């Protein structure tokens, strides 16, 4: 601000000197004005003074409605300013036929008005995340947004009148479009602020706030996308490819597509929340921390995710509007593909279904724990097998020794007879250990014989790998021994040479 004051003072002094010289040398008003408008030095000084006046007015508006800017607001202002200047330069190349002093003044005014809009959006975000905001700040931000809306409407009406008066494509299309975008952004920011105030008056208990905010942003992106497309077509038909609109058009389309995808995913997840996420029992609430980490309040009733964490149903619904992962462990919450997906245990892949009757309580307790590296390899192999139509999956490596040799039974006592009898199926086939994981893929059950063949082949592969490692170690040992013998021989020869 001090540098602006100094620059403004020097600019005002230079302009006053030029005006005094023009009137003192010409002595009449009309010749003096002709001299000021035709002299290049005087013309540049007058333009500079006009720009300084606009900057001073911008500083006064900012100080009146916002006060001192925060560091985040200054950073946002600097980042957006450079991008906007580059886009304005591209726009100037498109409308070079309409280039004039008034066009430069309108462009400078547009940049300053856009900067005020960026600050307003950032200040509203700051107010929404601040616990206690004084009433003066609320009054200033409301009056500031109303002031911006009035300015947008005035510039928009001026551009539309110019466009209607000329009845042809001109630079007025550019300013009409820009101020229309700014006006819709101001309305969206103001409505979002109203949502915040309503939630604050309800002491943070307005459950529909996130839903309404999401719909507001969706409608705002749709309106902006429609305006960008219309303006792109209008400029393309009359002037050529508008390079300054390509980035904005792409970003708006990407944001709109992401919001549509989030909305569809949210509807899929919340359409059957009662069936997909069961209610937590009293024992589960007592066994775990009964505090919802979303709202930090005690839970009397809660929903249980597949990962085992508990949340309020309304907190979970509001969380799913923005995120699709567990708030605690960040495990993904995917929408159900069919009715059976909701009942699938955690950690089992869609193409791999567990055998009925083999589920144990230990598997439920281990659902929230981190899986080991070998189990991750097993799940990856099972998924690959299901994708390629295989009917088998490799068991964990810690079960290979258990299945590498068939169970042996003796007739030394009755217990041995019972064990041998219990290890046979009704058809006379030996069954595997109940703790061993059995997999289904595409409805086909892998037999015990196939499992044993896979186990034996994998065991042989391990044995071959170990043998090759042993051979390499033996070769390295021999080379080391040979090197040690050679060094000892060289040392002895050196000692004999010294003694001789």
From Swiss-Prot:
Cytoplasmic compartment residues: 1-3, 62-98, 157-170, 247-500
Predominant subcellular localization, coarse grouping: endoplasmic reticulum
Biased composition regions of type Low complexity, renumbered to the chain: 348-358
Lumenal side: 25-40, 120-135, 192-225
Reaction catalyzed: S-ubiquitinyl-[E2 ubiquitin-conjugating enzyme]-L-cysteine + [acceptor protein]-L-lysine = [E2 ubiquitin-conjugating enzyme]-L-cysteine + N(6)-ubiquitinyl-[acceptor protein]-L-lysine
InterPro entries: HRD1_E3_ubiq-ligases (IPR050731), Znf_RING (IPR001841), Znf_RING/FYVE/PHD (IPR013083)
Keywords: Endoplasmic reticulum, Membrane, Metal-binding, Transferase, Transmembrane, Transmembrane helix, Ubl conjugation pathway, Zinc, Zinc-finger
Compartment(s) where it occurs, according to its Swiss-Prot or TrEMBL record: Endoplasmic reticulum membrane
Ranges for region Disordered: 337-375, 398-438
Record protein name field: ERAD-associated E3 ubiquitin-protein ligase HRD1
Organism: Oryza sativa subsp. japonica (Rice)
Lineage, opening ranks: Eukaryota, Viridiplantae, Streptophyta, Embryophyta, Tracheophyta
The gene coding this protein: HRD1
